[in-house]
Amino acid sequence: MMKVSEQDSNLISSTDADAASGIVLNDISVTTATPELPSPLLTASGKLTNAALVLVKITSKCGIEGHSYLFSPNAKLLPALASAVSVAFEEIKGRSCSPETNTDHLLDKFKLFGGTGILTMAFAAIDMASWDLLGRALGKPLYRLWGGTNTSIPSYESSGLSIGSFSQVLDQAETFISNGNSRMKVRLGYETVKEEVTLLSRLKDELGDQIELMVDYNQGLTVDQAFERCKELDDLGLTWIEEPILADMLEKAADLTAASKTPIQLGENLWSLTEVERALNLGSSDYLMPDVAKIGGATQWLRAAKMAERHRIMVSSHLYPEISAHLMASISNAHYLEYADWTKLQFSGHRKATHNQVTLSDGSGVGLYED
């Protein structure tokens, strides 16, 4: 386990930390849900029709609740993921609601499991729910608890634009634009790069200069394919090319980043601060995109963002738009919030992206559920 430097600790004020020490974690409820996606998603990694969720509620001794959720790309693993959350909570039950301290405790307690994978996501669920509980207890939204002041977060649409026909992609892009969202991500992984160049060029021709495009290969290319395709995409003015190759091929990703004129984006499949540090030191990408669940929670996400800041790397979020908006509002090197509407029917406090931004409320905690 990577030791956290002092400058990456103490995410909140000493006054708030003192208040947290008097709040005791008492109970947890873990359930699952599989709401349908508003639009099925087809990527180079497969098709997604439902959002497989683990729903977590932690209650303090004084009855304050904190909520979080996890998204599982594979619904069959929901029982295992839910069980891991329950087991991990037993290790901190009865402790103070101090998310940073408790996350470090869990990482140390389970270090023989390697600190990655399902267990890391379990820690994340506890960490995020604990932060929500603390924010609600102190009457503060999380971005203010973390020292942020910006309430309008630049975002891009990621709710769809699956691999499909041009008419399907265009229809969805036009829907996004009708809501004022002209910044959007297109999934790639077509049989040939010629198809991809044609698709993107036609989108730009149809929609004009108003659109800003990112693309995502979802780890779908071989190294040779990635070099070939990134070169072919270089003249299209894309904001970034995301995860063209397997996420653990960080040395090859560094070579690709050096060769590509278009910025390379990765980070959603970095599962620890050690992996983040390695990627940053290698120069594996131009930008960083940690996933708040896979990295181990809000605590670890904010630490990763500080690490990126020292490398002068801009940070975007991956999924989880509700808590990610608070995270993005709290860092100085924020780039774009990934907005996906997958949970809009699950949580009454879900805030939609409009006009290329998500606007935070001043409600306490994360705000998954409106009071």
Label every PLM stretch briefly.
Residues 56, 63, 126, 139, ...:
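Conserved, mostly hydrophobic/aromatic
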Residues 248-339:
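Catalytic alpha/beta core domains of metabolic enzymes, predominantly
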Residues 144-145, 150-260:
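Metal-dependent enolase-superfamily TIM-barrel catalytic cores that perform enediolate-based chemistry
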Residues 14-23, 27, 31, 136, ...:
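N-terminal amphipathic alpha-helix/helix-capping segment at the start of soluble metabolic enzymes
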Residues 22-27, 59-137:
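Metal- or metallocofactor-binding catalytic centers and their adjacent structured scaffolds
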